[in-house]
Amino acid sequence: MIHQQHMRNIAQWLQENGITRATVAPDWMSIPCGFMACDAQRVICRIDECRGWSAGLALAPVMFRAQLNEQDLPLSLTVVGIAPEKLSAWAGADAERLTVTALPAITTYGEPEGNLLTGPWQPRVSYRKQWARWRVMILPILLILVALAVERGVTLWSVSEQVAQSRTQAEEQFLTLFPEQKRIVNLRSQVTMALKKYRPQADDTRLLAELSAIASTLKSASLSDIEMRGFTFDQKRQILHLQLRAANFASFDKLRSVLATDYVVQQDALQKEGDAVSGGVTLRRK
C-alpha cells in the first residue's frame, strides 16, 4: 500500500536540496494518492502527487468539505481506520458523488490504528520520552541497588580481613609453641601431628586451648624474650611441662608470677647457657 519508490524519491530530493530534517515532509506524503487514513488523534488525506492535508479529528470535517468544494468531479477515496458512513456525514449533500472503499485498519503493536508507514519510515519508540517517564522511579532503585552492592562488598572484605588476621595469629602462636617448625604448609595437619608427637593419648581440644593461652602470654611485651623449646603433657596427672629459654633469670620470675594466676607453678633448676638461661616449668590447673 505504501509507495516506497515515491518515498525514496522524496527522500533523495530532500537530501539533494540540503533538507536534512524529515519533519519538513508532510505526513500525508507517506500514503498513496487517493487514500485517507485515520487514527485516534488525526486524519491524513493525500489528494494527488503534490497535494494533501492533515488535521485533528475536530478540524478534519472542515478540511474534507474544503477538498470536496475544490473538486467538481466525483471523488473516489480508499480509507483506513474510518467508517464510510462518517465520511458521508462529513460530505453532507455532496455524498452522492463520493465513492468510498474501506480497508481493514492496520494496527502495529504499540502504534495507533491507521499507521501506514513501513520500512525505514516506520515510527520508532521515543526512548527519551520513556526515560523521562520512568527515571523518577528508576534512579532511586538504581541508587538503592548500588548501595546494597557496596555494603555487601564491604562486608565480604571485612570478613576476609578478619579471617586473614585470625589465621596470622594462629600461625604465630603455633610457631611460638613449636619453634622446631620452621614453615607452615597446612596448619591444621601440622598442629595435629605436633600434638600426637608430644601427647599421644589426650584430649586435643583442651590441650590446644591451654597451649594457645600460654602462647598468648609468652607474646606479651614483658615476656617477649622467652622462647618455647618444647613441652610434654602428662594426661593421667594433668600436668604440662614446658622447656623454656630466656634472656635472664628475671624473665623466669616474671613468667612464674603471670602463670600463677591460673596454674600451680613449679620451676625446675635454671641453667646458664652463654648469654641466656634455660630451664623448665611444670604447670597444673588450679
Swiss-Prot record:
Subcellular location(s) of the protein: Cell inner membrane
Keywords on record: Cell inner membrane, Cell membrane, Membrane, Protein transport, Transmembrane, Transmembrane helix, Transport
Induction line: Expressed at low levels in exponential phase in rich medium (at protein level).
Classification via Pfam families: GspL_C (PF12693)
Gene3D superfamilies from the UniProt entry: General secretion pathway protein M, EpsM
First-listed, main subcellular location of the protein, grouped into a coarse class: membrane
Protein origin, superkingdom: Bacteria
Leader sequence segment: none
Family assignment from sequence similarity: Belongs to the GSP L family.
Something else known: In many other E.coli strains this gene is part of a type II secretion system, but in MG1655 the locus is missing a number of genes.
The name this protein goes by in its record: Putative type II secretion system L-type protein YghE
